[in-house]
């Protein structure tokens, strides 16, 4: 799987909106539905990891 390289605007755990590159992106979809893409991000201030929704046109990577 290729590494993620495009930045996405997300809200961090502290509530700030920043542009981050996800560590990994995967698809969550229940049977028979479209689903959403979720990314794993690391907060630059605290170093903690969190998940956030990414746009549907973002490639699956990680």
UniProtKB/Swiss-Prot annotation:
One of its GO terms (cellular component) is chromosome. The keyword DNA-binding applies. It holds the Pfam family Cren7. The keyword Endoplasmic reticulum does not apply. Methylated at multiple sites, to varying extents. Coiled coil: none annotated. It comes from the Archaea. It is found in: Chromosome; Cytoplasm. One of its GO terms (molecular function) is double-stranded DNA binding. Its main location: cytoplasm. Disulfide bonds: none annotated. Keywords: Chromosome, Cytoplasm, DNA-binding, Methylation. Monomer. A chromatin protein, binds double-stranded DNA without sequence specificity. Constrains negative DNA supercoils. Belongs to the Cren7 family. This is Chromatin protein Cren7. It comes from Staphylothermus marinus (strain ATCC 43588 / DSM 3639 / JCM 9404 / F1). The lineage of its organism: Archaea, Thermoproteota, Thermoprotei, Desulfurococcales, Desulfurococcaceae.
